[in-house]
Amino acid sequence: MNNIWWQTKGQGNVHLVLLHGWGLNAEVWRCIDEELSSHFTLHLVDLPGFGRSQGFGALSLADMAEAVLQQAPDKAIWLGWSLGGLVASQIALTHPERVQALVTVASSPCFSARDDWPGIKPDVLAGFQQQLSDDFQRTVERFLALQTMGTETARQDARALKKTVLALPMPEVDVLNGGLEILKTVDLRQPLQNVPMPFLRLYGYLDGLVPRKVVPMLDKLWPRSKSYIFAKAAHAPFISHPVEFCHLLVALKQRL
């Protein structure tokens, strides 16, 4: 049975949908869900094949976006972290009337490094894909450790991420591989130039997966969007800086 796991909580006239990153699930938001649900009607989602959304194989980005939309409110702020940022962006491109505002967190429209573009080296992503078939739990843990490296709270942030992964059944290897394939191949730099809704991009200065060099490049490419860098955060600013993170989202709501 292919069912997306979906939880709605809180009250507010503005809906906020949170989409997690690769290898994880919606439990990753528990550090901020109480605060956010006092300002928004909050929607927590396990992406297809992750967490409690079982019964899915590897999906393309477009199919993942369509699957998530099935249970979504008519209109919401869509916030996506890392891989989830690509899913939220895809929804903004294909169903702009459903997106009140787009927020991407530690996400890139093109995660893979190109000649003219900083990112994760393609051979690193290919290496992760290879290692998944050998020892996928260890590979996922390595990927999580990369996400918090360099921050003052790196150890406890990494522990929080690991706890999130271990709280629920691990995704199937083909689902994890499919997610890496999306990170390796998708490039939304040009399409996202024309999104009509407010667009907020949040980054960690110490992020080892989304280099801060992309921020001014995207400021130039997407002049209508706004960017913000958490000075002491890495790839998971909502875990290391929850108060500041929630404040930015409440401020966005007040501007709508």
From Swiss-Prot:
Family: Belongs to the AB hydrolase superfamily. Carboxylesterase BioH family.
Transmembrane parts of this sequence: none
Enzyme Commission number(s): 3.1.1.85
Organism expressing this protein natively: Shigella boydii serotype 4 (strain Sb227)
Protein name per the record: Pimeloyl-[acyl-carrier protein] methyl ester esterase
Superkingdom classification of source: Bacteria
GO terms, biological process: biotin biosynthetic process
Catalytic activity: 6-carboxyhexanoyl-[ACP] methyl ester + H2O = 6-carboxyhexanoyl-[ACP] + methanol + H(+)
Lineage: Bacteria, Pseudomonadati, Pseudomonadota, Gammaproteobacteria, Enterobacterales
Pfam families noted in UniProt: Abhydrolase_1 (PF00561)
Keywords linked to the UniProt accession: Biotin biosynthesis, Cytoplasm, Hydrolase, Serine esterase
Binding of substrate, residues: W22, S82, L83, F143, L144, A145, L146, Q147, H235
Pathway in which the depicted protein is active: Cofactor biosynthesis; biotin biosynthesis
